[in-house]
Structure formats: structure tokens, C-alpha cells
Amino acid sequence: MAIVPKRKTSKQRKHKRQSHSALKLPNLVSCSNCANKKLPHHICQFCGFYKNRKIISFKAVNDKN
């Protein structure tokens, strides 16, 4: 035989238990070089700067038109 719960879990108890599993929005900051939104302590994906230094240089993509 399987184990059966002794009492029904109330909505309040269920919601209290699930309160820590909510998804959190990322904390975005603006880039000091290009003012686009980026994650803090990460290189800007638009300009390649981090702490006012150029870390990554992007190559220009040429269209075949």
C-alpha cells in the first residue's frame, strides 16, 4: 500500500512553501559607454566595453547586397 497524507494541505501552507520558487527579474544597469542595458559585472554585448575599457572588438558584418 502507498503512503497517504493524513490531512489535506491547505492553500495557505501550499503558497507559503512555494513562495521561494518564484522567478526573479534580472537586475539591469546601463552601459557607461553606449547606455544600452546590460547585466552588472558583465561585458556589454553591444559595444564590448567593461569598466570603460574595450575588451572585445566586433568585426563589421558586410551584407551581400
UniProtKB/Swiss-Prot annotation:
<comment type="similarity">
    <text>Belongs to the bacterial ribosomal protein bL32 family.</text>
</comment>
<keyword id="KW-0687">Ribonucleoprotein</keyword>
<feature type="compositionally biased region" description="Basic residues">
    <location>
        <begin position="1"/>
        <end position="19"/>
    </location>
</feature>
<protein>
    <recommendedName>
        <fullName>Large ribosomal subunit protein bL32</fullName>
    </recommendedName>
</protein>
<feature type="region of interest" description="Disordered">
    <location>
        <begin position="1"/>
        <end position="21"/>
    </location>
</feature>
<dbReference type="GO" id="GO:0003735">
    <property type="term" value="F:structural constituent of ribosome"/>
</dbReference>
<dbReference type="InterPro" id="IPR044957">
    <property type="entry name" value="Ribosomal_bL32_bact"/>
</dbReference>
<dbReference type="GO" id="GO:0006412">
    <property type="term" value="P:translation"/>
</dbReference>
<dbReference type="Pfam" id="PF01783">
    <property type="entry name" value="Ribosomal_L32p"/>
</dbReference>
<dbReference type="InterPro" id="IPR002677">
    <property type="entry name" value="Ribosomal_bL32"/>
</dbReference>
<dbReference type="InterPro" id="IPR011332">
    <property type="entry name" value="Ribosomal_zn-bd"/>
</dbReference>
<dbReference type="GO" id="GO:0015934">
    <property type="term" value="C:large ribosomal subunit"/>
</dbReference>
<keyword id="KW-0689">Ribosomal protein</keyword>
